[in-house]
């Protein structure tokens, strides 16, 4: 497993070694020991989620507050997405900064988004299936959303006129969001 640092040090790309031949391929998609060594702490995943979306769908920017803050290990198993993490930790030197990574069934990369980040993605292919592990359970009461198009964050989304849920259309401005300390 190759671990790649992003512009935001706590957000990491995990790139598996893929062994292929005329029969197909094999890869180790997750290894707890390698993962914990890379992130520098013990992480216990408690839930796996799987979504399917069509081209142009944008989901985000989502996060949960304590005590239900979630770290996410995300990947795209069908198609391709542009995946984004926004640092919402007030005490961080990268507060308000974002990082974007293309994740696809072809590149098989995964992105680690720790607690204290808002997360979103948009679908670049005709359809995409998105799978992710979380280290905390979903909590409707602690769920929050930041407006995907907030000008103060200025994410360079590679889609025009995205398809959005009502929840994502009505996300909070970054300046009004609930941050992490």
Curated annotation (Swiss-Prot):
Pathway membership: Carbohydrate biosynthesis; dTDP-L-rhamnose biosynthesis; Bacterial outer membrane biogenesis; LPS O-antigen biosynthesis
Chain segments annotated as transmembrane: none
InterPro entries according to UniProt: RmlC-like, RmlC-like_jellyroll, RmlC_Cupin_sf
Keywords (A to Z) from UniProt: Carbohydrate metabolism, Isomerase, Lipopolysaccharide biosynthesis
Site (Participates in a stacking interaction with the thymidine ring of dTDP-4-oxo-6-deoxyglucose): 138
Quaternary structure, from the entry: Homodimer.
Official protein name in the record: dTDP-4-dehydrorhamnose 3,5-epimerase
Gene: rfbC
């Amino acid at each position: 497993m190759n671990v790649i640092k992003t512009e935001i040090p706590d957000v990491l790309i995990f790139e598996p070694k893929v062994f292929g031949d005329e029969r197909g391929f094999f890869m180790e998609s997750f290894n707890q020991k390698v993962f914990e060594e890379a992130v520098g702490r013990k992480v216990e995943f408690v839930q796996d989620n799987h979504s399917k979306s069509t081209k142009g769908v944008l989901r985000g920017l989502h996060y949960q507050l304590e005590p239900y803050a979630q770290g996410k290990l995300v990947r795209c198993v069908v198609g391709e997405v542009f995946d984004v993490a926004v640092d919402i930790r007030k005490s961080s030197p990268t507060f308000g900064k974002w990082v974007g990574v293309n994740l696809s069934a072809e590149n098989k990369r995964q992105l680690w988004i720790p607690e204290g980040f808002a997360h979103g993605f948009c679908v670049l292919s005709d359809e995409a299936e998105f799978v992710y592990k979380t280290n905390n359970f979903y909590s409707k009461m602690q769920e929050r959303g930041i407006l995907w198009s907030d000008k103060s964050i200025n994410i360079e989304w590679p889609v025009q006129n995205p398809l959005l849920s009502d929840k994502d259309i009505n996300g909070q401005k970054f300046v009004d969001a609930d941050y992490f300390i």
